[in-house]
Regions:
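Histidine-centered copper-binding motifs that mark active-site loops
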Residues: 1-171
Length: 172
């Protein structure tokens, strides 16, 4: 079992709002962009499933409990009502790995992957404005989709990596 803490630090000055979506007001009286974290890859209990209206406002903290009952690659992303895509685009998305001591295949036989070095990558496309800041055109006819012109790997545009001549396990 893991407890993962999310602290919302997206205020109205740093958070981008499109259309008529309004900021949420936290119990501390501060306003900001709401977040709700949803995790794919685990049978989470309802309070930790990140449903769209269970939001954390600016300055607030929420602890999520995940059972980690099996090995695998999971991922999390924002799930706040009407702004999921924007929050994920600006960074509230990532990978979550659960590893066992031995990687066992479907028939109970070892996969023999335990000594292979792993590399983890998140792939996405983004658009940058003239100041090299992430950008979404709120008036674009594809406002609910994004067709980025720059490929990012784990947050880095067009990266490169030096590798040794050996086996690697890539998790994407």
């Amino acid at each position: 079992e893991s407890i993962v803490r999310f602290r919302n630090r997206i205020n109205t000055e740093t958070g981008y709002f499109r259309g008529s979506y309004s900021p949420c007001i936290a119990s501390n009286g501060k306003s900001g962009r709401p977040i709700s974290v949803h995790f794919h890859g685990s049978a989470s209990l309802a309070p930790y499933d990140g449903w769209a209206e269970d939001v954390t406002c600016f300055g607030e903290i929420k602890d999520y409990v995940y059972p980690n009952f099996r090995s695998g690659t999971g991922w999390y992303h924002d799930h706040a009502l009407h702004i999921t895509a924007h929050n994920a685009y600006y960074g509230l998305a990532g990978m979550y790995f659960i590893t066992a001591k031995k990687s066992i295949g479907g028939c109970g036989e070892p996969w023999n992957l335990d000594d292979i070095e792993e590399k983890h990558f998140i792939l996405n496309d983004k658009v940058l404005n003239s100041k090299c800041q992430l950008y979404i055109d709120p008036f674009d006819k594809h406002k609910d989709n994004l067709y980025g012109d720059i490929n990012f790997v784990s947050g880095i545009p067009f990266p490169n990596m030096k590798l040794e001549p050996k086996l690697y396990r890539f998790r994407l």
